[in-house]
Amino acid sequence: MEAPTGQRTVGAGHSYYTGAGRRIGCFWAVLLLLALAVLLLAGVMHVDVRLLMPQLGDQVDGPPVTNVMFLKTHKTASSTVLNILFRFAETHNLSAALPAGGRFHLGYPWLFLARYVEGAEQGGPERRFNIMCNHLRFNPPEVQKVMPNDTFYFSILRNPVFQLESSFVYYKSHVPAFRNVTSLDAFLASPWAYYNQSLGLSNAYARNSMWFDLGFDNDAPPKEDYVRARLLDVERRFQLLLIAEHFDESMVLLRRLLRWRLDDVVAFRLNARSRHSVTSLSPAGQERAKHWCALDWRLYQHFNRTFWARLRAELSPRRLRSEVARLRERRRELAALCLQDSEPKNKSQITDFRLRPYQSGRADIMGYNLKPGLDNQTLQTCQRMVMPELQYMAHLYTLQFPDKPPKNIAFLEA
Ligand SMILES: Nc1ncnc2c1ncn2[C@@H]1O[C@H](COP(=O)(O)OS(=O)(=O)O)[C@@H](OP(=O)(O)O)[C@H]1O
């Protein structure tokens, strides 16, 4: 006898669903086993799982830090950091403390004053900004006038031997102490023949320039008590000192402390010299540079130590390795997406003047050409990543102060 249609349907349906239920159960069991196997394999092969599931690694606890002051020291990879901060300001609609009027820095080499910031004196004495990162000579009470109380302060240091070599080539014709000497080795062999202490500020790039940028006396004798007291000052004022030689590890640490996303801290190397404008110092010259810049040498040694101690406190070695690997991988992806030939170009090869960095002295400062044919959104992302310091500052200035005359960067066209 044939069962009524409805019963048969229900019966058939029931057995169908029972079979399907079994299949679904199997599916989840297999998936669970697979996941366990991957985790086991990752453990055995010392692979960080976040490398396999990148979206997991981009999770951060709590809101991002948005009040940030970066002391932009000279010739220390600071333009690359500035690019990161300007991008963050622009994409998060944050205000930046930019140089007033037609200026390109915040009063450097004079000690910073709040009135060097555009708009600091408008809207009453309480006007505060989110991001501050243009060159200035650090002067905490004045910086505090334009930055909120909960600002995160950080800076970056570089081995003074290489920092001095970079300065020498870049500021060769600008700094009196460097003007009349053929090489840095010759300068370091008898610095007092070229360095006139009474010229003060104009020679700041020639000796202990990071110490000077921090607001201290770059000609002070490196006496133990004095050095220790100033290092303590820096520790009190800054939450973090990064190290240019370990730039990627620095970005991992910075991102963690600021609770930013990975893409916020991925950057291309900016303001780098082409290989033919880098000179090498003899081993004796290197030792003399450490002696000549003894204050910077102490500064660098001290904060190189604290940097690694901080990294160890924040991340296990394996986690650090995997985060650095992820950062590099993402940089490679973005280079392939944005850059012509995925690499930097020297000044004569850069076709768009808006992307050509400011050139100084004998240095050939490299930049980038973008790939042709990028869609609008990708183009915007890529342009931001390769935009040199002066152009980016002028761009933000126009966005922030549309009624003011724009910064005149026509000289970059030459
Ligand atoms: N990501 C990264 N890692 C390591 N080093 C880097 C990085 N980005 C820039 N650089 C090097 O930093 C030098 C430029 O420093 P600044 O941008 O601070 O110079 S400036 O004071 O703003 O003119 C310049 O050094 P030299 O090439 O020796 O002159 C750059 O090569």
Predicted regions and their residues:
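Membrane-interface amphipathic segments in extracytoplasmic regions
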Residues: 2-414
